[in-house]
Amino acid sequence: LRGNTGGLLTNAVFVANLFIEKGRLVSIVGRNGYRYDVMARDTDLEIKKPVIVLVNGASASASEILSGALKDYHKAKIIGTKTYGKGMVQKIIPLPNETGLNLTIAKYLTPKGKDINKKGISPDIEVEFTPKDISERKDVQLETAKYILEKMIAKK
């Protein structure tokens, strides 16, 4: 999910449901306090293998919903840097002359009730790129993910 700026809520929920078979996947809370919980659907597809998810400051919106759900349920280790923090639902209200007003109408919460908006998802293991890493084209986040994944597999 590193560099993934978002997408559709339905896709994030579909992927989360591959790892989480029961419980809340995300909550949508409106300005009036109305809360809608998107629940996992019971499937026989639950993935139980070790999983690492890479995130960074460009991971936003639907990718934060997915990484937040996986983190809250301990279904994946999240590695990288804090995500962007775009956890809001917006609606475009059409205006004259083919213009529109983008109005925020609700916010997303992780399964444990953490507000994503302006806060982002903090990784389980923070790994930042240094200028040297960048100049040497060294992907320290991916290297860390491989190392952690090998340790996770060895424990099983």
Which residues make up each language-model segment?
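Conserved P-loop NTPase
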Residues: Q90-I93, L101-F129
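Sec-exported extracytoplasmic/periplasmic mature domains
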Residues: N17-R24, S59-A60, K71-K75, Y147-A154
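Terminal peptide-recognition signature
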Residues: F19, V51, L70, G113, ...
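Generic beta-strand/beta-sheet core signal
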Residues: L1-R2, I28, L54-N56, I79-T81, ...
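C-terminal recognition in membrane/secretory proteostasis and scaffolding
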Residues: L1-A12, I28, Y36-V38, V127-K156
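Gly/Ser/Thr-rich loop/hinge elements
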Residues: T5-S61, M88-P94, L109
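Short, well-structured beta-strand/strand-turn elements
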Residues: Y73-K86
